[in-house]
């Protein structure tokens, strides 16, 4: 028991249970009857809390400095309403005993503030309700709605500006992260304020309804239950009801004012006092003009001379003081410049790792006319397509592609975009931001009016048309593609060609974690057989030739077995390809038939001799064997021809070669004829039928 008590007290000291207990106590006031003395304390606390919130709202330099305000607004509104319930219970049960039955605070507001006259009190209460409900609350609610909408609409532009500053080196990564959090917090704050303003409005409506209920109920109870005269019942219950209403409505008005001040703040430089000094009182000429007007009114017969003369003197003195400030500012300017220079020189020396911007694996920069493609209001078309590209590439290669960052770049042309891989520009293009791309197909007939151009990704001739021409282009057989899809297709092409470069050590860890979940013992054996450097070479060799790492269990099994014979990453990759031969050849097979080109005997013998001689002379990688320049020129002309001939025949371009020649010829195919797939004899499954279309000579 003692231990439990100590733990509970420790939680209280840590502040973990403080707020929940306060909320539970507030809710308990609805059920439990409260003595008048406790009501006095709670009403006083309610007024003090409202004053504190108002002062914090006035002194806050920007709304995010008081981000807790929506929550406080909800709690204080709930507290005020529960106090209304508790005080109503006391007034109706014990109001016949006299005005002091509901507590000293309610009695004081009923007697002192409204002079003991229930008519005056009723009028004052109605005026307060009009000010609170119609003026302050209504305006704050509207401003909250507009601020929330505009803040959400401005988020993409603010994020782009942060990314632009980061790219330009104006801020570091930590500062960019802080700014992004501020932008998100600002959106959350104004969204919460939009809802919190409904609390204030509901509180004002509830105050009017509670007043009416207390008024009618109290008078009826006094007359019919306690046999009071109508005049005595009105005098007694109405004064307590009005006092109760004023005690609740004054804090409500203070909080409504605080809410209005928070949502109307547009400056991030200082509090309200600072803004008043630097904006309202900044111009001496305005103050002198107001001084003259006050003096003229003071000398008009029948006017109260003293108040106008006092304000005339006060405004004149303020204007004179403000006119002296520019001179003082000039006197301090030189010392300020010296101080600024010293600070700048000191800050320039504070260079650390944190100030060096990190290189992002993949990023897409947009000109300002293309920024609309990532606008939430338009459905984020580019963001969604880029996310789809990342998903498809990750699924196809069996590795998680890094996130593709999208940002605005003011250095680009308005309709230009650029794709960066590891911080280096891989490609760029300029497309009409407000047009659609019409791509001709085999079923296209006729020509459509538009701007002729080329597809940024593949260089095919296209026509850029207006959105209104889309239906016509589709009817003519064109494929119509929007700007977001054009950019996403280009990103897809570029990223696929850089997959091996994007695969790094951390990806090996994630890949092996995946393997451990499926085959824990195999993962341990693989880690013992090959280190990360060796594995990275093997995985990159496979990805370079488009071999997916999805079947990591089979790949790991082969690597563990083959690593006892060799550590050469090319030979290890060849063994993996042999194990995955069915998945590798599957895209090229038509009806169990594989159509290929081969090497003629003369070329095959020549290349075999070159490879054998190179290996005898020293350790040379199979894909880096030196070849005669004339033979390279021959490959440069014949390999593209083989590729085009097979594509023209409707076949997948495949070149079948001996195993020891495959790494070398696959490298040349990537250089001279991208898309020409090089297979070795032993990579063809036994059940397939080979059809030789020709021979490379």
UniProtKB/Swiss-Prot annotation:
The keyword Transmembrane appears for this protein: yes
Gene Ontology biological process terms in this record: bacterial-type flagellum assembly; protein secretion
The keyword Chloroplast appears for this protein: no
InterPro entries: FHIPEP_1, FHIPEP_3, FHIPEP_4, FHIPEP_CS, FlhA, T3SS_FHIPEP
Regions that span the bilayer: 19-39, 40-60, 66-86, 116-136, 204-224, 242-262, 280-302
Function field: Part of the flagellar gene cluster Flag-2. However, the Flag-2 flagellar system could be inactive in strain 042 due to a frameshift in lfgC.
Name listed for the protein in its UniProt record: Putative flagellar export/assembly protein LfhA
Lineage, highest ranks first: Bacteria, Pseudomonadati, Pseudomonadota, Gammaproteobacteria, Enterobacterales
Name of the gene: lfhA
